[in-house]
Structures are given as C-alpha cells and as structure tokens.
Amino acid sequence: MIETVSTAAMPSEQETNATNSPFQTVKTIATLILLLLVLPLNLALTAIALLRSIIIKPFQSRTIAESPQTILVGGGKRTKALQLARSFHKAGHRVILVETHKYWLTGHRYSWAVDRFYTVPNPQTEEYPHALLKIVQQEKVDVYVPVSSAGGSYYDAKAKSVLSPHCTVMQLDVETLQRLDDKYEMATAAKALGLRVPKSYRITNPQQVIDFDFSDAQRPYILKSIPYDSIRRLDLTKLPCTTEPETAAFVKSLPISESKPWIMQEYIPGQEYCTHSTIRDGHLQLHCCCKSSAFQINYQNVDRPDIENWIRQFAKSLNLTGQVSFDFMEAADDGQIYAIECNPRTHSAITVFYDHPDVAKAYLEPDPLPQIVQPLASSRPTYWIYHEIWRLVTHLWSPKQVYERLKIIAQGKDAIFEWDDPLPFLMVHHWHIPLLLWADLQKTNEWIRIDFNIGELVEIGGE
C-alpha cells in the first residue's frame, strides 16, 4: 500500500478583502463547472483501469533491481517528476516524492509509483536544504533527482553541498549552473569550444543597443532577458526596428540594467528543437530531441545526430553532472544547427521515455553506459489531453487544425494517464487543479491559463 506523508498544514486562509475581477471569477467558475462535467467520464475511465490492474496484476512479474535504491524526486507536481517516479519504480526502486507546502494537493502523490510523499518550504528559504536533508536521512535516500522550476534550479544546486555527503545529487554545482543559465555566458563557453551559437552581446544599458551598428548585420537581432522572464520571453521583436526612434523607444521600454542584464542575440529563423540530456561525469547517459516552438507542449523524439554530438562535446568539455536542456535552431538560410540557450534542469520532453526500461540506469549507474538511452522507436508522442481539447475547441473553424489535433490525440499518448497507474490522472484534473481554482476565487492575482504539465495556474509574475 502506498503511504503518503505531508509535513505541511492546510493552506492559510486568504484575506477576506481580496477579490477577483468579475471576468476572472466567471472564468474560474466556468472552468470548475467544465471539470465537474467531465468527472463522470474520468471516474469511469479510472474505474476500468483499476479493475484491469486487479485482473492482470497476479499474472505480472515485478522487476526486482539487483541493488534496490531509494530515490528522492523533487518538483512533485510536475509531470516530468511523475514520469521519473514511474521509471524508477518500474525498475524496482523505492521512490519518495517531494513538493513545496503550497502544492501539498498534487495529484501525483497518489501514484502507485510513490512510496512516500513529503512537503518542504519554498526553495528560496534557508530551511529548504535542511528539510531535504531531514528526508534524506530519515528515508535513507541514495539519490536525489531534483525536478526544478526555472527559479528553483539555483536553490537545488545550493542544496547539493548540504546533501552530497549523504546521497548522490543529480544536479550541477552552483557555479556551473549559473554559467549555463546565463544565456550570454553559455554562448561564450560554447563558442570557446568551437561549437556553433548565434552572435551574442551582453546588454546592461539600453544605450548599448541604441549605439550598436546594425549596418553589417546579416540577420536581425532579438533581445532576451538573462534572468527568467515568464512574460517577455515570448517577445521576439526584431532589431533594428524600422526607424532609429522606434528602436530606441522599444529598448527603453525594457527593464535592462546591471542587475537585470539582457542578451542581444542574432535571430535565427528556422525549425526549433528542444532537448533533454542526463549526464554523469561528462558522459551523456540519456538523451532525447523533439521539434519545438514557444507554445508547443507535444513531444515526439526525432533523430538529430548533429545536435546529440554538440551536446556530447559540450558536456564532456565541462565535465557536467546533472540534467540539462538545450534549445537549438536549424537555420532556414544556411541549414546549420545553432544552440540558442540552455536550461539546466529537467525538460518535459522526458515524458517520451514513458515505456523505456533503462531510464533508471541512466540516472543511477555511476559508469558510462555502453549506449545512450534514447526513446524507443515504438514510443508514441506525448501530450496533455485538456491542452489538446482546448486547442481543438478554439480552432473549430479550421478543418486543418481540427484534423491535426484529432490526429495528435489518436496517435499519441496522454503524458499523465497510465493504465497501470490511473489515479494521478483523476486526481490532477479533479482534485489538484480544482482546489487551485477554488483558492483563486479568493485571490487578487489573475491566472492566464492552466498548465496541466507543471500542475499550476500560470499567473503574471509566476514561475
């Protein structure tokens, strides 16, 4: 029987004078009603899956690991954390799932892959590494695999020094993480290794852009915040603008400063790719590559040896240990691959390993594997069903879009639902998200969209 342990109390009562706008309230209530309407269908699906498991379980043999380990997986509300928990569990290991106090309600805690569930303080607090250490010591954890947010990866890197004497930590050290998370520093490091990156400049004052000589530029440039910016990261305004005053006005509208530097980077038009790589002592252990875009949350592995070789050389040269995700562009003009940024943390594309038996080896084996673990050729693309339904409903006037969405649903696989582990699917959509929506009715912050992938309501200024 799965045991879940939460060290968090129920969320504190919101201030009574905090109210939403009428539109936000209607939107939230309407969403709650829609989730309630599909509850009977999902209950039936879960019941069928549970009955199926009861019938076939006696005929299944569970994998017994040669050296069973206890794995602590962080970021428990994210689908990628659930996927890793399932992969470790299927390989015969014991999984402890952890999340912050705010998300004590995560539906993933009900997964049969999870032996115990804990909550901890926010990563930004001084208590965070010590709370993790307490769990590591209490549960005799062998390996900690953080599944961090954009802002949380730094704090998991800091926690590594506290945890390392007690367990293996699959995380970059602070110095390396900051270097890779800094778009300009990453580009500089890659260029020094002879690896292809766009032309890049560190910007700490708008005047640098205003004074820049664009006359010899073969491609336009874009500006990106080096510290993570959830809103402006999607702004791909091309520079220079039509006129110099327009360029100056645009640049001055951005919060550029010494403390909040930006990168001015050559804009590479073409096909974007996202990757996930698990690396130990500079050796690439696990790798996937998927076509991508700013709004895409569908993942299907594609074979790109040139991208794999780029990452392999980079990882070996810097002797990395941890999880890193790179974004690449295949330029439409010259056909070359350019690395545009690195996110030193787990990528949601790891969901394409849902049926691979060797994921645990990639994380736990101390020696290089004879072959890199890559998604099976038979693996289906992954998606999140309610994201797809929303896209379908909002494009009903386009037969092409409707066909495309139905094709994705028919040929792919929901990233949360598993026939032999159905409870997370039910609990995320009818417990986790509804409770977040209910709490939102008492808040002043307005949510923009529901991200079922990371298990939260996306708000301006959020993660």
Predicted regions located by residue number:
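Active-site nucleotide/adenylate-binding loops and adjacent lid/helix of ATP-dependent enzymes
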Residues: 177-262, 269, 280-283, 293, ...
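A long amphipathic alpha-helix within ATP-dependent nucleotide-binding catalytic cores
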Residues: 254-258, 294-336
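A short beta-strand motif that forms the metal-chelation/ATP-contact edge
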Residues: 277, 286-288, 335-345
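Glycine-rich phosphate/pyrophosphate-binding beta-alpha loops
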Residues: 292-298, 343-356
